[in-house]
């Protein structure tokens, strides 16, 4: 709903008049930056989901998309026992996913590390998994996860994926990009 005078949302105008509930105090929120541990420069997918069967469903999605892929999945529960659920077909990648999931510490998030597959090969299947809410990143770049923390828990605010732009591509850069995509088989030669 919009007010008629200055087109600001009516609820924003009225919010200043609402008295706080008895005993209410604003929760302090701290935002921290968590560097994703990725010593081999593997592809990592970080996202948010909402249900305990996520780890198993993501396993099936990746396995069905790229059968030769090696991967590890860690999913942080947000209620009940609040465990990190683990699936995958490579022990080292499962361990890496768990270490990063614990470091991020945000409920209902998942971390997937991939070997012998690119995110572009599995993202559609991951997105089509019914419990997946969003994907924050899918990259092999260095990643920092921005995590908001209050007394109850943590949530991902966003990610810093890679580095800042250093300029705008030239015609030579464009030619290199087009050749690279054909070289790795993602565009017809």
Residues of each region from the PLM?
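Gly/Ser/Thr-rich loops at beta-strand to alpha-helix junctions
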Residues: 51-52, 79-80, 90-91, 115-120, ...
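A general structural signal for well-ordered alpha-helical packing
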Residues: 55-59, 94-101, 123
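N-terminal, charge-rich interaction modules
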Residues: 27-86, 171-189
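Helix-rich interaction surfaces within compact, conserved domain-sized segments
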Residues: 100-106, 117-189
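Positively charged, polar, low-complexity stretches
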Residues: 78-102
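Short, Lys/Arg-enriched N-terminal segments with co-localized hydrophobic residues
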Residues: 9-27
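Structural motif
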Residues: 42-45, 69-74, 83, 108-111, ...
